[in-house]
Amino acid sequence: MTTYSPKVGEVQRNWYVIDAEDIVLGRLATTAANLLRGKHKPQYAPHIDTGDFVVVVNASKIALTGKKATDSLRYDHSGRPGGLRVTSIGEMLAKNPRRAVERAVWGMMPKNKLSRQQLKKLKVYGGPEHPHAAQNPQPYEITQIAQ
């Protein structure tokens, strides 16, 4: 008997919606990354995109633990002299919460061509509304310890 390998056309894709209100950013990112990669499915294969679509709503109400809002920093450099920009996670959440969540999920994914394709299935919205009602997304609950 040969080992089963999923084919690209056989993959059944589901849509999940995650409410990020009062959810810790790291826990949300790991859950979303696992759903995007398809690791929750028995047909998972690391070389084939078996993942689902993930819609994250209320990204502006996400939680950070400890002093991460001020002490966790992100460094960007333009490549020119004096081109270093330092941004805290709190500033990033205030300015663009969508980008902060996308960046956290990106950090949980492998760095290859397949993950770039899988990240295109992540949709993040700052408020409670999203335009994907036609896809009938299923709510996905993240269980967490009280903060």
Curated annotation (Swiss-Prot):
Top-rank taxon: Bacteria
Protein name: Large ribosomal subunit protein uL13
Keywords: Ribonucleoprotein, Ribosomal protein
Complex formation: Part of the 50S ribosomal subunit.
GO cellular component, one term: cytosolic large ribosomal subunit
GO function terms (MF aspect): mRNA binding; structural constituent of ribosome
Database matches in Pfam families: Ribosomal_L13 (PF00572)
Family membership: Belongs to the universal ribosomal protein uL13 family.
Function as written in the Swiss-Prot or TrEMBL entry: This protein is one of the early assembly proteins of the 50S ribosomal subunit, although it is not seen to bind rRNA by itself. It is important during the early stages of 50S assembly.
Region described as Disordered: 126-147
Record-annotated membrane-spanning stretches: none
Gene3D superfamilies in the record: Ribosomal protein L13 (3.90.1180.10)
HAMAP family, per the entry: Ribosomal_uL13
Database matches in CDD domains: Ribosomal_L13
